[in-house]
Swiss-Prot record:
Pfam family, one: DUF1507
Source taxon at top rank: Bacteria
Signal peptide residue numbers: none
Protein name: UPF0358 protein lwe1048
InterPro entries to which the protein is assigned, alphabetical: UPF0358, UPF0358_sf
SUPFAM superfamilies: EF2458-like (SSF140404)
Residue spans crossing the bilayer: none
Family designation: Belongs to the UPF0358 family.
Length: 93
């Protein structure tokens, strides 16, 4: 049973990482092709996506699939990547 829980845990972490990567990719496309970071539509998409990911992480934490600290680290890493992307975008314009 412990091995099965470990498999679910690893799968949950991998799915959350994939979702974080998808958010980053979505924001990259939006910044490259559609809108500026100051645009309300950009901010709305980013806020919605980040909120959704935080709810997924909360759900996985409540199920015991990930540790709270691991979820915080995932959000923090994504926020850092998005901040770097934002800075690069602003320096190009």
């Amino acid at each position: 049973m412990a091995n099965k829980k470990k498999d679910h845990r690893e799968e949950a972490v991998e799915l959350l990482k994939q979702d974080a990567k998808r958010i980053l990719q979505l924001i990259k496309v939006q910044m490259d092709n559609l809108t500026l970071p100051q645009c309300p539509a950009y901010e709305e998409v980013l806020d919605t996506q980040m909120y959704g990911l935080s709810r997924e992480i909360n759900f996985a934490t409540r199920l015991g699939l990930i540790e709270p600290e691991e979820g915080k680290n995932l959000i923090s890493a994504l926020e850092k990547e998005l901040s770097t992307l934002h800075e690069l975008s602003m320096s190009k314009k």
